[in-house]
Amino acid sequence: MSVANSRIAVYPGTFDPITNGHIDLVNRAAPLFERVVVGVAYSPSKGPALPLERRVELAQEALAAHANVEVRGFDTLLAHFVRDMGAGVLLRGLRAVSDFEYEFQMASMNRHLIPEVETLFLTPAEQYSFISSSLVREIARLGGDVSGFVPASVVDALRQVRESRAQV
């Protein structure tokens, strides 16, 4: 078991896809920590639009400006991933009060599983507070413009998904 280091934070999620809200959170967290690991969860039960490898690539492209940010995919229990990374902080984003109940429950469970790790909540800048990956996927699936919510590489990836499904 690794020793928890409070200068290392893990920011987990499915990032299906990564949004400008996620990027904003990492942009604000990166100066606070020696290292931020963006953990891209496999999450097959969520039926992701993009495969894990592609979600990792898109996150790496979007966050490449940060020398202290690393993007890694994982398919294990989050508590195990956090320990493997040696992190002492688990970062979570709160967009609205509606996120709080779920996030509070998750933080409580994680406190039991990894008591040496603190959960830290960050809120996005106001202009990103309404963006969610699920809304972005739905807008893209229906042919809407998501360019204001995600990086250009994600717009292209979602367009490719839509086109490939249209051919089936």
From Swiss-Prot:
Its main subcellular localisation, reduced to a broad class, is: cytoplasm
Transmembrane annotation, as ranges: none
Amino-acid positions noted as binding ATP in the UniProt annotation, renumbered to this chain: 14-15, 22, 93-95, 103, 128-134
Which Pfam families does the protein's record reference? CTP_transf_like
The record's listing under PANTHER family reads:
PHOSPHOPANTETHEINE ADENYLYLTRANSFERASE
GO CC annotations on file: cytoplasm
Q: Which reaction does it catalyse?
A: (R)-4'-phosphopantetheine + ATP + H(+) = 3'-dephospho-CoA + diphosphate
- Cofactor(s) for this UniProt protein: Mg(2+)
Localization of this protein: Cytoplasm
This protein's name: Phosphopantetheine adenylyltransferase
Gene Ontology BP, a term: coenzyme A biosynthetic process
Top EC category:
transferase
Similarity section: Belongs to the bacterial CoaD family.
Its keywords, alphabetically, are: ATP-binding, Coenzyme A biosynthesis, Cytoplasm, Magnesium, Nucleotide-binding, Nucleotidyltransferase, Transferase
Identify the species of origin: Xanthomonas campestris pv. campestris (strain B100)
Query: What the protein does?
Result: Reversibly transfers an adenylyl group from ATP to 4'-phosphopantetheine, yielding dephospho-CoA (dPCoA) and pyrophosphate.
Q: Which gene encodes it?
A: coaD
User: Which sites bind substrate?
Assistant: 14, 46, 78, 92
Q: Name the InterPro entries on file.
A: Cyt_trans-like, PPAT, Rossmann-like_a/b/a_fold
A molecular function annotated in GO for this UniProt entry is: pantetheine-phosphate adenylyltransferase activity
Its Enzyme Commission number(s) read 2.7.7.3
